[in-house]
Curated annotation (Swiss-Prot):
This is Oligopeptide transport ATP-binding protein OppF. It comes from Lactococcus lactis subsp. lactis (strain IL1403). Keywords: ATP-binding, Cell membrane, Membrane, Nucleotide-binding, Peptide transport, Protein transport, Translocase, Transport. Its EC number is 7.4.2.6. It comes from the Bacteria. InterPro entries: AAA+_ATPase, ABC_transp_ATP-bind, ABC_transporter-like_ATP-bd, ABC_transporter-like_CS, Oligopep_ABC_C, P-loop_NTPase.
Length: 319
């Protein structure tokens, strides 16, 4: 598979100002030197706790946040430059599904106009072609035709998210950034929305950057995974690399927090969580610099990278 988007040394800093003259005295390193590659038709998971910088990366990719430095390489060119972004029709090819579907939908517009908006922004087609396209999109996400004349408040959370998905795929994008797309939904509704996303990917060949804190969902949805902590990637690899052979103490910490429905192993799981948490506290100084930032990534295999101490002392899988 060929590359669709390549992030090179991406940095997003927010200045901290203080004093009478409101001078910049420090920076919040929301994203600090991230490298990430997304290939055509694949789903890359970006996971981490709140404040790790994962959503900032997603917003930077679609242009909702401004990067401090680095490169966004799309079709071999740096689309951080606005002129090149427009030439390559980047904003048409890269769309986003938001966490809060209701807030992302204009309450004054009908569903027809909401789905039609990106088509009208990027394509010049006649009314009949537009109408046909919108009805096709509605069928894809499983909503009835009468929904087109209704407004966002008339739908449930799951239906609103499906409307958001229909809007995202309206321009036939190459990549969709999905930022916590199901975190606000009930479990039964989550499954419906996730299955729609997988079906759309299979039918249309769209690549996804799937941003989430829920490792169970990420395991179900993704091919490759990057784990973020404090603005940096601490480990990345295939789904098997991350779930079966985790190497970084933070990755192990996240995995140990996944709830289990097996009540017979509840005591064992709790004991393991406490062990992993203690291991994290004991070894933290070896895996992070004095400012709390992860060390540079080391290549462990063709698909697996982790931010390990010098000498790779933690290359083991005792999770």
């Amino acid at each position: 598979m060929s590359e669709i988007l390549n992030l090179k040394d991406l940095k997003v800093y927010y200045p901290i100002r203080s004093g009478f003259f409101n001078r910049v005295t420090d920076n919040v390193l929301a994203v600090d030197g991230v490298d990430l590659t997304i290939h055509e038709g694949e789903t890359v998971g970006l996971v981490g706790e709140s404040g790790s910088g994962k959503s900032t990366i997603g917003k930077t990719i679609v242009g909702l946040e401004q990067m401090t430095s680095g490169q966004l390489i799309y079709k071999g060119q740096d689309v951080s430059k606005k002129k090149i972004r427009n030439q390559l029709k980047y904003n048409k090819d890269v769309q986003m599904i938001f966490q809060d579907a209701f807030s992302s939908l204009n309450p004054r517009k009908t569903i027809y106009d909401i789905i039609a908006e990106p088509i009208r922004n990027f394509e010049k087609i006649d009314a009949n072609t537009e109408n046909k396209r919108i009805h096709e999109l509605l069928d894809i996400v499983g909503l009835p035709k009468q929904a087109l004349e209704q407004y966002p408040f008339q739908f449930s959370g799951g239906q609103q998210q499906r409307i958001g998905i229909a809007r995202a795929v309206a321009t036939n994008p190459k990549l969709i950034v999905a930022d916590e797309p199901v975190s606000a939904l009930d479990l039964s509704v989550q499954a419906q929305v996730l299955n729609f996303m997988k079906l759309i990917q299979k039918d249309l060949g769209i690549a996804f950057l799937f941003i989430s804190h829920d490792l169970g969902v990420v395991r179900h949805m993704t091919d490759n995974i990057a784990v973020m902590h404090n603005g940096r990637i601490v480990e990345k690899g295939t789904r098997r690399d991350i779930f079966d052979e985790p190497q970084h103490i933070y990755t192990k910490r996240l995995l140990s927090a996944i709830p289990s429905i097996d009540v017979t192993r509840r005591a064992e799981n709790r004991k393991n969580r406490l062990k992993v948490e203690q291991d994290f506290e004991d070894k933290k100084a070896n895996f992070y610099d004095k400012d709390g930032h992860a060390l540079p990534l080391k290549k462990l295999s063709e698909s697996h990278w982790a931010a390990l101490p010098k000498g790779g002392e933690n290359v083991e899988s005792n999770y």
